[in-house]
Amino acid sequence: MHTGAFMSDQQDRIYATSHSQVGRFSFDDTVVRVFPDMIRRSVPGYPTIIDMIGVLAARYAQPDTCLYDLGCSLGAAATAMATLTGDTGNPIVAVDNSRAMIEQAENLLSQAGQAHRVTLQEGDVAEMAFNSCSMAVLNFTLQFIALEKRDALIRRLADATVPGGILVLSEKIRFANDAENALQTELHHAFKRNNGYSDLEISQKRNALENVLIPETLAAHETRLKKAGYRQIHVWFRCFNFVSLLAVR
């Protein structure tokens, strides 16, 4: 069953016309309206990642613990977790700091018949306290959090995760080797062009994300996870400069 990214009839044309000055990217009403199309055409393998988050939830959800979708956007990961854990009783908490995202997520969760399983919260995941959990998802979220706040967030998540519980961390990454970084970036741009984005759209979106999305190397993520107390760290998905890690507590 495909629970993946919520589909949308609205195509992302935000950067299709030339802007004299490109503003900083934000998850506002304009982005929310086209987000399903934007994420599908911009992130290689995004629907697969969402579906496999559901599969991982079915395997790792433990009794009397909650499941977190942190930086939930429209709640696709939370919906996948809810769908494949059935009525286990695990509370699922989905958090985002964008009011526009939360409001639309409420509508989509109702349409998916999962509103009763998922509690939506508007808030900053870098500042919130966590209850005992067996699974947390940071699906392309950490990259938007200030670098100086990332260590503490991952430590607090690890502390809240029960033994055998997991963190799914999906991120756009950079490479220490300049040549590899350039190649992987160009391959990602080729992916976007193949999905209908123009060079103008790719360039303006990249400018908008400058100093908003701050990628790190895979090694930096693995080091942070180990220091926080995760016992096993596995790369379970990778395409170009996008990866998803499975960290086991």
Curated annotation (Swiss-Prot):
InterPro entries: CmoA, Methyltransf_25, SAM-dependent_MTases_sf. Keywords: S-adenosyl-L-methionine, Transferase. It catalyses: prephenate + S-adenosyl-L-methionine = carboxy-S-adenosyl-L-methionine + 3-phenylpyruvate + H2O. S-adenosyl-L-methionine binds at Y46, G71, C72, S73, D96, N97, D124, V125, N139, R206. GO terms for molecular function: carboxyl- or carbamoyltransferase activity; S-adenosyl-L-methionine binding. Its EC number is 2.1.3.-. It comes from the Bacteria. Gene3D superfamilies: Vaccinia Virus protein VP39. CDD domains: AdoMet_MTases. GO terms for biological process: tRNA wobble uridine modification. It is an enzyme of class 2 (transferase). HAMAP family: Cx_SAM_synthase. Catalyzes the conversion of S-adenosyl-L-methionine (SAM) to carboxy-S-adenosyl-L-methionine (Cx-SAM). Homodimer. Belongs to the class I-like SAM-binding methyltransferase superfamily. Cx-SAM synthase family. This is Carboxy-S-adenosyl-L-methionine synthase. It comes from Alcanivorax borkumensis (strain ATCC 700651 / DSM 11573 / NCIMB 13689 / SK2). The gene is cmoA.
